[in-house]
């Protein structure tokens, strides 16, 4: 397989970091120098073959890429479709998150930073960041809402084992949004020696573009793999969506293809009329959060509302600005599935294919059932963004197996 590198796209933001009206850089003055330094460094390296050959080495030898595109035969038989799973769950650390952290870690080293910080929800991005810090010999601190540290205690232990410090955040809803607030607050006062590794396609420019570029390795591989297997492009590409990085990576190389429909699946929680969900596009409105303009869950006064999902990685009350743009322009489509549907799909995939997905990925799998009629006789790729190890304790408490 030829070496992965980002390619310019019609969906790139403008020079001020806007995807249409979304995105931008709404941050305190004190952060502008760090963001401008990062933007300038990334612009230099974005198409630099030497940098990407170093990245290529780590993606292959350390992360274990390319990840397989697996034909799910028993799912396909049941649905009357050809279902392929892009196996991001097989990456080192068990999810797509490491694609991004390994490249941001190499960028931090290039900039001479000694310390990296990150926010995390489900803990997967925190573990991936702590992993890269250990690999590259960097100091690491991870911010995590106290609600998430309680439901993801194994990932908290993993981060500590990897010699990272974990800051439990007690403010606000004590989840991902608040962890991100604290990480940004910390960065404001430590920007000189600290690199902030954002885990999703959100935040101020250049992060949404950078993280999308780094995760686009998913569709770079999947496109080649499906052409080898089917000698044609898929009809549909599906990915779950919280902040939206695995979906952005899965969509990136397919968005330019007229024949391919990209579908992002939000967290429907207890139902999108219930106020207990994470469906920012279905139920949100444009506003500003974490340095960007995008769709947010907010009340009539513009106060951010708490997002909810069975999955700690999907309960973010906003969405990456590129997704907001793709949603409004119709270049991609978005739907949602409930906790109950995701849990059913979690069991379904486990028992049909012997693959236990993360709760996040189970949302994308659930959509195959929810919209099964539209997939009949079609070729479909689903991003299996992570494995279910981290969700075992929660699943055991929710499912009654005798």
Swiss-Prot record:
The modification N6-(pyridoxal phosphate)lysine is found at residue 97. Keywords: Amino-acid biosynthesis, Aromatic amino acid biosynthesis, Lyase, Pyridoxal phosphate, Tryptophan biosynthesis. Pathway: Amino-acid biosynthesis; L-tryptophan biosynthesis; L-tryptophan from chorismate: step 5/5. Its cofactor is pyridoxal 5'-phosphate. GO terms for cellular component: cytoplasm. It catalyses: (1S,2R)-1-C-(indol-3-yl)glycerol 3-phosphate + L-serine = D-glyceraldehyde 3-phosphate + L-tryptophan + H2O. InterPro entries: Trp_synth_b_CS, Trp_synth_beta, Trp_synth_beta/beta-like, TrpB-like_PALP, TrpB-like_PALP_sf. It comes from the Bacteria. SUPFAM superfamilies: Tryptophan synthase beta subunit-like PLP-dependent enzymes. It is an enzyme of class 4 (lyase). Its EC number is 4.2.1.20. GO terms for molecular function: tryptophan synthase activity. Tetramer of two alpha and two beta chains. Belongs to the TrpB family. The beta subunit is responsible for the synthesis of L-tryptophan from indole and L-serine. This is Tryptophan synthase beta chain 2. It comes from Wolinella succinogenes (strain ATCC 29543 / DSM 1740 / CCUG 13145 / JCM 31913 / LMG 7466 / NCTC 11488 / FDC 602W). The gene is trpB2.
């Amino acid at each position: 397989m030829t070496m992965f590198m980002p390619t310019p796209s019609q969906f790139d933001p403008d020079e001020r970091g806007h995807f249409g009206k979304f995105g931008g850089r709404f941050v305190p003055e004190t952060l502008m120098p760090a963001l401008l330094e990062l933007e300038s460094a990334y612009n230099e390296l974005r198409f630099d073959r030497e940098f990407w050959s170093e990245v290529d080495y780590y993606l292959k030898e350390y992360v274990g890429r390319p990840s397989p595109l697996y034909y799910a035969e028993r799912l396909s038989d049941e649905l009357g479709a050809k279902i392929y799973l892009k196996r991001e769950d097989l990456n080192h650390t068990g999810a797509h998150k490491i694609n991004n952290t390994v490249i941001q870690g190499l960028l931090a080293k290039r900039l001479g930073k000694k310390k990296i910080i990150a926010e995390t929800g489900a803990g997967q991005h925190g573990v991936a960041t702590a992993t890269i810090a250990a690999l590259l010999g960097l100091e690491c601190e991870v911010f995590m809402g106290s609600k998430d540290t309680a439901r993801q205690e194994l990932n908290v232990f993993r981060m500590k084992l990897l010699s990272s410090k974990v800051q439990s955040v007690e403010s606000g809803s004590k989840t991902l949004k608040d962890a991100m607030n604290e990480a940004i607050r910390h960065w404001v006062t430590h920007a000189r020696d600290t690199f902030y590794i954002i885990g999703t396609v959100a935040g101020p420019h250049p992060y949404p573009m950078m993280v999308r570029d780094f995760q686009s390795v998913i569709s770079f591989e999947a496109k080649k793999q499906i052409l080898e297997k089917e000698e044609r492009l898929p009809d549909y590409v599906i990915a779950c969506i919280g902040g939206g990085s695995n979906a952005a990576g899965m969509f990136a190389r397919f968005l330019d293809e007229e024949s391919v429909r990209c579908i992002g699946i939000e967290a429907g929680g207890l139902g999108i009329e219930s106020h207990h969900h994470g469906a920012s596009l279905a139920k949100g409105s444009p506003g500003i959060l974490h340095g960007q303009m995008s769709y947010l869950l907010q009340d009539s006064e513009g106060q951010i509302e708490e997002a909810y999902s069975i999955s700690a990685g999907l309960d973010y009350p906003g969405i990456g600005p590129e997704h907001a743009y793709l949603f409004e322009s119709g270049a991609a489509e978005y739907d949602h599935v409930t906790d109950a549907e995701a849990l059913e799909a979690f069991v379904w995939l486990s028992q049909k294919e012997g693959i236990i997905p993360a709760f996040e990925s189970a949302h994308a799998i659930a959509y195959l059932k929810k919209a099964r009629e539209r997939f009949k006789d079609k070729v479909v790729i689903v991003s299996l963004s992570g494995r279910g190890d981290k969700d075992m304790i929660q699943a055991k408490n929710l499912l009654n197996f005798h």
